[in-house]
C-alpha cells in the first residue's frame, strides 16, 4: 500500500508526512471573532512550523434545535472567508450541505467538507466531486471504517481522487461517541490521508437536551492518542470563550491553550513518524 499525497499549495497531506492542522472555529459567529481566531492560529502554527488550514462553517444545518444559531449563511460567510484568506494568506476548509452550494464555495475555499450525516448522499457527493476541489469526508457515526471505501468509490467514479478521510467518533449507545483507534488504522489502509477530528469526537450528541454536550477536559488525552497512530492531519476547533460559544462550546479548546496543546501534538507526531514500521502480521 502506498500513501496518497494530496498537494495544497506548498502543503503536502499524507499519512507519512508531518501532520497538517485543520483548525479554527465551529461556526462563523462574527467577522471580528473569525479574524481574531484565524490570526491566533496563524501565529501559533507559524511559530511551531505546523502546516495549517483555517476551518469554520457558514451554516450549521444539522443543529439539534430549530432555535439554535446556524451561522451567517453562504453569501456573508464567503465574504469573511475571502478576507481571512487574503489577510493571513491561509488555505480554507468549510462544509457544504446542498448541491447548489458546491460550485460557489469551491471558488473561494480550498477544501470542501462532506458532513458525516450526509456522507451517503450521492447527488451531493457527485456535485462536490465535480468542483475538482480537495474533499474531506467525515466518517458517519453509524458507519464501520471499511464502509468508507464505498464513499471513496463514489467520488472516484465522479472524477475526483483528491480525498481525505476524517474520523469523528462512532455512536456508542445513546448520547455518546467513542473513537475506534484501530478503525482509523483501517482507514489508513486505503492509502488516503486520514484526519482525526479530536474535538467533535468529544461530543455527547443531544447531551444537553436541545444541543450537544461535550468533554472538553479530555481534549488533550484523546488527541494525543490519535496522533500516536501516525496520521495525515488533526482537526480541532477553539474559541476564546468556549462556555459562551454559539455552537459546540463544550467540545472547543480554549483558544489561549492552543500553543501548549499543539506543541504536544507536534511532539507526538514527530516521535511516531521517526520510528521504523514494524510488520507484526508476519
UniProtKB/Swiss-Prot annotation:
SUPFAM superfamilies: Aldolase. One of its GO terms (biological process) is keto-3-deoxy-D-manno-octulosonic acid biosynthetic process. It catalyses: D-arabinose 5-phosphate + phosphoenolpyruvate + H2O = 3-deoxy-alpha-D-manno-2-octulosonate-8-phosphate + phosphate. Pathway: Carbohydrate biosynthesis; 3-deoxy-D-manno-octulosonate biosynthesis; 3-deoxy-D-manno-octulosonate from D-ribulose 5-phosphate: step 2/3; Bacterial outer membrane biogenesis; lipopolysaccharide biosynthesis. It is found in: Cytoplasm. One of its GO terms (molecular function) is 3-deoxy-8-phosphooctulonate synthase activity. GO terms for cellular component: cytoplasm. This is 2-dehydro-3-deoxyphosphooctonate aldolase. The gene is kdsA.
Amino acid at each position: 500500500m502506498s500513501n496518497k499525497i494530496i498537494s495544497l499549495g506548498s502543503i503536502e497531506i499524507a499519512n507519512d508526512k508531518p501532520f497538517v492542522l485543520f483548525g479554527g472555529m465551529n461556526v462563523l459567529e462574527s467577522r471580528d471573532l473569525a479574524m481574531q481566531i484565524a490570526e491566533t492560529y496563524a501565529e501559533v502554527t507559524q511559530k511551531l512550523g505546523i502546516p495549517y488550514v483555517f476551518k469554520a462553517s457558514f451554516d450549521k444545518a444539522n443543529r439539534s434545535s430549530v432555535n439554535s444559531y446556524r451561522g451567517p449563511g453562504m453569501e456573508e460567510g464567503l465574504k469573511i472567508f475571502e478576507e481571512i484568506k487574503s489577510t493571513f494568506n491561509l488555505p480554507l476548509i468549510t462544509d457544504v450541505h446542498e448541491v447548489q452550494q458546491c460550485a460557489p464555495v469551491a471558488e473561494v475555499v480550498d477544501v470542501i467538507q462532506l458532513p458525516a450525516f450526509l456522507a451517503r448522499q450521492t447527488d451531493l457527493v457527485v456535485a462536490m466531486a465535480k468542483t475538482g476541489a480537495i474533499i474531506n469526508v467525515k466518517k458517519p457515526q453509524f458507519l464501520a471504517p471499511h464502509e468508507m471505501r464505498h464513499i471513496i468509490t463514489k467520488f472516484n467514479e465522479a472524477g475526483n481522487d483528491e480525498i481525505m478521510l476524517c474520523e469523528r467518533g462512532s455512536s456508542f449507545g445513546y448520547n455518546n461517541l467513542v473513537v475506534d483507534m484501530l478503525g482509523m488504522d483501517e482507514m489508513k489502509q486505503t492509502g488516503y490521508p486520514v484526519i482525526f477530528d479530536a474535538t467533535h469526537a468529544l461530543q455527547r450528541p443531544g447531551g444537553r437536551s436541545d444541543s450537544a454536550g461535550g468533554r472538553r477536559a479530555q481534549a488533550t488525552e484523546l488527541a494525543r492518542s490519535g496522533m500516536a497512530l501516525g496520521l495525515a492531519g488533526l482537526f480541532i476547533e477553539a474559541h476564546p470563550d468556549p462556555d459562551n460559544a454559539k455552537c459546540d462550546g463544550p467540545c472547543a479548546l480554549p483558544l489561549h491553550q492552543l500553543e501548549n496543546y499543539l506543541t504536544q501534538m507536534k511532539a507526538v507526531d514527530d516521535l511516531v513518524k521517526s520510528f521504523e514500521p514494524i510488520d507484526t502480521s508476519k
